[in-house]
Amino acid sequence: MLRKISLFMLFTIVWSYQKFQMLIPNGDAVPNPCAGQSGIWGGVGHNVAAGGGLNNQFGLDFNSSGKVWTPEFCQKDSDQDGKSNGFELGDADCKWTPGGTPEGIATGHPGVCEPMNSSKCQQVNKNITCSPSNYT
């Protein structure tokens, strides 16, 4: 019984992130910005790559936009690194719509200030967790 509950919870979590990933351009291909790590940051709106727990500023802004990719949300710089959310997600012109193909690839993480080792970004990223166990 415990195994069934665990599998159900895992499926629910994975499905939830996939659902949200489809609502932003390249949501399933956001690069992991942590030094020495590679792969995809699956929980784009969260402080840990695997998702869950607290939202990062991008996740908070996503919720504030009604979970809709709007021109305003696209043009916003949620992580304060000088690059708009759209630019980092491959939609610099903010023309992407769900189900469409973004004009480019995701070049950064819209919820993690980069470069992470800069003094500005270290302060902005104080709640971001870079731990290998958190990556997908």
Tell where the protein language model's regions lie, with residue ranges.
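Calcium-binding acidic motifs and repeat modules
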Residues: 2-80, 86-136
